[in-house]
Amino acid sequence: MRKFIFCLLLLPVTIGAFYLAGSAAYAQDAGGAAGLYKQGREEFLKFTPAGFDKAIELYNQAIKADPNYAQAYAGLAEVYSFMGFYRYQVREEYENYYNQSYTNMAKALQINPNLEEVQLALAYTYLQLSREKEAKTTAQKILAKNPNNTEAIYILWSASGENPDSPEIRKVLELNPKFVPAYVGLANALFFKKRAYGQATQYFKKAAEIAPSAQIHNLFGTALRTQGHYNEAIGEYEKAIKENSNYAPAYMNLGITYYYLNKFNQNIDNQKKAISLNPNYPDAYFFIAQGYEKANNPQQAVVYYKKFLEVSLEQEMYAGYAAQAKERISALGGGK
C-alpha cells in the first residue's frame, strides 16, 4: 500500500453532496472546454506516459477555453498525482508533480466541489497520498449516486487493503476490461499477498497488452523472473528499455536476471547503467558487489558492498542484504 504523505494533508475541504455530470456536459463541440476535457480524460485513461502528457496538454487547452471549467482542473490534479506517485516509486524527483496536483485540486474544489469528476479526482489524490480513510469515504459518496462508477469501485478496493479475493476488483474488470490500474493492482496483490506468481503474471501480461509502458513491462518481467523464466523476463526488461531508455529499474532487474544466469559481466554492466541513471537503488550496488565477488574481484566487491550499506541506510527492507554485505566485507578482508 502507498506509504507517502504530502502537502495535500493540509487541504481544507468539506465534502458535501454532489450531483452527477451527465453526457450533456460534453455537448459542446470538440474545441470547447467540455470536448477538450473529454479528449483529455480519454488520454488519461490509457494509463501510458504519452497518454498522461497528452491529457495535460488537452486539460490546459480546456482551461484556456474556459478558466472556470472545474473538471479540467480536476483532471490535471488526477494526472499529476499519478505522475508524482510514479516518480516517488521509481525514486525520481516527484515534489513538483504533487505540488501541481495540489494546486489544481484546490482550484477545482474552489470552483465546484460537488461535481462527480472533481470528487473522483479527490478520491484518486487521497489514494495516492495514503489517505485511505478519506479515499474510501469519497469513493463511497460517488458510489451512493453511481454504483457502477468503475474508478470509484477500484479506489474503494485499493483503499480497503487490495484484497485479491475481493469481488470488488473482479467487478471493476467486468465493467471495464481495459482498466489498467485494476490489472496492475490485482497482479501486485496476488504477487505480494498470496505469492500467486503465475496468476499475477497473467494480469501483468494483460496490462502490458493494453498499455505497454516501461513500468508495466518491468513488473511483468519480475513476475516471470520470480518463477525462473529468465529468458522471458529478459525479453520484458528489454521491452521496458525500448519504451524508455532512461528507466533505471529495468536495467537493474535485467542485471539481476543475468546474475542468476551466471552472466556476471552483463549483470555488472546493467547495474552500472542503472546507477548512472538513478543512484538511489541499493539493489544495484548489492548485485554489482555480488557480481564482482563471483568474478573473483574481491576488492571491487568490497567497494560495492560498502556503497550498498551507505545507500540502503539500514532500511528494514534491506536487512537481509545488509547482513550478508557485512559478512562478505569481513570475509573478504574489507573490514580492516
Task: List PLM regions with ranges.
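Structural signature of tandem alpha-helical TPR/SEL1-like repeats
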Residues: A50-E57, F85-K107, Q128-K141, S160-K171, ...
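TPR-adjacent "capping" and linker segments in tetratricopeptide-repeat scaffold/adaptor proteins
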Residues: A25-Y37, E92
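Residue-level recognition of tetratricopeptide repeat
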Residues: R41, E78, Y124, S158, ...
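Terminal, low-structured helical/coil segments at or just beyond the last alpha-helical repeat
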Residues: K294, Q299-K336
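Alpha-helical segment of the N-proximal tetratricopeptide repeat
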Residues: A34-Q61, A65, P181, G185-F192
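Structural marker of alpha-solenoid helical repeat scaffolds
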Residues: A65, I111, K145, L175, ...
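Helix-start (N-cap) detector for alpha-helical repeat units in TPR-like alpha-solenoids
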Residues: A33, A70-Q71, E116-E117, T150-E151, ...
